[in-house]
UniProtKB/Swiss-Prot annotation:
InterPro entries: AC_1 (IPR043990), AIDA (IPR030930), Autotransporte_beta (IPR005546), Autotransporte_beta_dom_sf (IPR036709), Autotransporter_pectin_lyase_C (IPR012332), ESPR (IPR024973), Pectin_lyase_fold/virulence (IPR011050)
Keywords associated with the record: Cell outer membrane, Membrane, Periplasm, Secreted, Signal, Transmembrane, Transmembrane beta strand
Keyword Lyase: no
Annotated phenotype, changing S803P: In strain: ML 308-225
Quaternary structure (record): Interaction with TamA of the translocation and assembly module (TAM) initiates insertion in the outer membrane.
Function, in words: Controls colony form variation and autoaggregation. May function as an adhesin.
Superkingdom of source: Bacteria
Chain ranges of the Autotransporter domain: 737-1039
Protein name per the record: Antigen 43
Effect noted on mutating E493V: In strain: ML 308-225
Signal sequence extent: 1-52
The organism of origin for this protein: Escherichia coli (strain K12)
Cellular component annotations (GO), alphabetically ordered: cell outer membrane; cell surface; extracellular region; periplasmic space
Amino acid sequence: MKRHLNTCYRLVWNHMTGAFVVASELARARGKRGGVAVALSLAAVTSLPVLAADIVVHPGETVNGGTLANHDNQIVFGTTNGMTISTGLEYGPDNEANTGGQWVQDGGTANKTTVTSGGLQRVNPGGSVSDTVISAGGGQSLQGRAVNTTLNGGEQWMHEGAIATGTVINDKGWQVVKPGTVATDTVVNTGAEGGPDAENGDTGQFVRGDAVRTTINKNGRQIVRAEGTANTTVVYAGGDQTVHGHALDTTLNGGYQYVHNGGTASDTVVNSDGWQIVKNGGVAGNTTVNQKGRLQVDAGGTATNVTLKQGGALVTSTAATVTGINRLGAFSVVEGKADNVVLENGGRLDVLTGHTATNTRVDDGGTLDVRNGGTATTVSMGNGGVLLADSGAAVSGTRSDGKAFSIGGGQADALMLEKGSSFTLNAGDTATDTTVNGGLFTARGGTLAGTTTLNNGAILTLSGKTVNNDTLTIREGDALLQGGSLTGNGSVEKSGSGTLTVSNTTLTQKAVNLNEGTLTLNDSTVTTDVIAQRGTALKLTGSTVLNGAIDPTNVTLASGATWNIPDNATVQSVVDDLSHAGQIHFTSTRTGKFVPATLKVKNLNGQNGTISLRVRPDMAQNNADRLVIDGGRATGKTILNLVNAGNSASGLATSGKGIQVVEAINGATTEEGAFVQGNRLQAGAFNYSLNRDSDESWYLRSENAYRAEVPLYASMLTQAMDYDRIVAGSRSHQTGVNGENNSVRLSIQGGHLGHDNNGGIARGATPESSGSYGFVRLEGDLMRTEVAGMSVTAGVYGAAGHSSVDVKDDDGSRAGTVRDDAGSLGGYLNLVHTSSGLWADIVAQGTRHSMKASSDNNDFRARGWGWLGSLETGLPFSITDNLMLEPQLQYTWQGLSLDDGKDNAGYVKFGHGSAQHVRAGFRLGSHNDMTFGEGTSSRAPLRDSAKHSVSELPVNWWVQPSVIRTFSSRGDMRVGTSTAGSGMTFSPSQNGTSLDLQAGLEARVRENITLGVQAGYAHSVSGSSAEGYNGQATLNVTF
């Protein structure tokens, strides 16, 4: 093979092939020193399965096309065109250990090379390449010259002595300009992916050497490190230059330049939309800021010899150092003092605490921010200029209209806050004659004096309690009053076609005058009268509560809003159109005579809103608040909640049309269903219901049916006496099995009792009822003896029980429930003629009742005493040896006295109740000998006292049909009020006839123990007599 004359060769043993191979030391060195090349060659031949191809392009030789892959090498001393390189980065980017790819040696040239992922083009000193395109994952290591390289995600590493001209850096490409290198006419289209001033550093251009005439386009970034220099850079919109080293003659055509600590920028020109930012420790000299350009100097930054052209912006604070000239002449910001500064087009000066500013000009788009404790004098505010301050600053100057203003000593006078301006009034300070034209006025307490004006989007934000004793006016456009509390004896004046929104505020003023436009109250509590002009609109939204009158305007109440209309308002409430989904209440703070209030509405659109009206059912005239529909229509649905404003126990029967609560006048109409009654109104014995009349007005009328509590309370007498009679029982319920010894009996009984509907309370009958009862009774004989051929037994008993009865109104609707807890004590005397069996049973009983009557609207309690006397007789006849027939007759007389009381609609009084009952019937049953005899149990402990089986027990059964007649029942119940004529008396009758059937079974289970069970049913066949069913179990022990 023909080689270059200075080529030397070396035999290298290949362990894989087991033979010596020849390696060109110069070729393999690729410009590196020989020892390194030999070591790398040995590594290659011992690590690769076959020796990689080694292609040499000799001087004068030209190779067109071809691809390097799989660790191939091309050493170029001549010329290559159109090569594709896909290998060479075996050890990663910019690594000296890499040996593959294309190596352009001294005198070699490579044109239009394509480097793909994993490919390496190395240009050694004296070598040159042009028009190389490097894709993502590929790289160019440059020590020679490269012209017009394109980095399409690829990388270019410039080592000492390298020169790169016309490099284009596209998406995620990276050019590293190391010390001792020069990159000229670079175009940077990537690098800013991390956002403004992000130090991502691995895309775009990274300069540690020299970068000349760089163009930075949108999304491009040049980072100039401390040892780097960038000269004559142009930065377009969306691109930026980050300077830690030196930047000379940079032009910002919409792009940004960031000068960091230790960095310097000289002779920068900032054109329209360009922005130079000098950070803490950064230095900029001789910057020129043209129209719409911006220079920002942060605290600790320095910019000297600045030329600020008209329309250019300066953004800085008194903690920075800035000197130069502007359209007013020389200006400076040095050591906390600013003088002759012009602020416009986004310019801003922050005057910090303890610092000063003099002769400041604030024009359109400029902002002067004077912090608490800062001072700004001779301020000239132009149209569109923004002032930010609070009452702890000291500011004086002229407004855009030429008027003087000042802030100082806790007093602000004649401030004008344009859009973007902000002033904060601190607690204890005062702001007089403030005008807010689209700006923000924040009051943290303090006092508003003179005329405070809000226009064109102005915002007044309150924090804490602020006082206004003068006038808060809105003249043009929209305005917002939000938060906190505004109190005082001042007024709010709303003019102009815009909207004033009061949000989350407590507003208490002498008046709100709504002259034009719309007033929206949102989630606020407002206590004042709203005096409006026709054609205006008032909206109550959210959870707003308005306490005051409205006259006159169009009103909208949202579902959560409330309007309280006081009876002491300065004007009568008059509304044109009312759209109502909220709550309206008539309220009063007056004592003494009832004075009804009136709300007049032209058109009402009800949206399930409520109106609470005060009503005096105990008064014949002027007895209710009133809604007046004047000449318009009432549509939709409005709920009227009725409040008894007088004695809650008062109530009269209405006469005529009733109590007027909605009045239609001047041809007004109301739809059927436009108003519904939201709650029951009760007074005395009456319910009052809402009715629409033919005159389109609505009235409350006392109902023909009495309120639910009337039958409920009337049933209490009947329920208590029914219970007493059941407890007293009859002889068959008491005496059990006859015997010669005294006995003790324990009985448990439960059942159902009630009364049918026989015309109800209106017809003098006992109200319809149905319920249950239960009791436990313990009784015992005290004496058993024989006197003059008669057996005499005397004893006492006690019982405790409970009954619960549901009562219905005359129309069948539920009236309520009466519950009774009762305790009884009684005595009895039994007389039995020994020879004939004729017997008589005498019972006397007293019961203490504790009763509670509950309806939907009331809970009423009463206590009382019941008494009862009973005489019963019977004569048994034997039909067979074991079958007996016993005719029976019983007379019972009972009484009841309940305490008087009152509920929330009136008093309740009970007269003495009484009733007489006669029962006639017979008892048919077995009459077996109940002698226990000898025990037959097979268990030793029970052998003498128990039977072997149930069939051996002595048992008797019986049935007892009867007719019960109730007569002479009395019992008055009176309800009413202290108002003359309001009381009514009801005397529900219990008279009637019922059929009763009882049946039982008795068994002697021990010599001295008898068990009995019984069940019965009573059915009313006439009148209001009681009916029901019962069950009982009795344990009888003799001794």
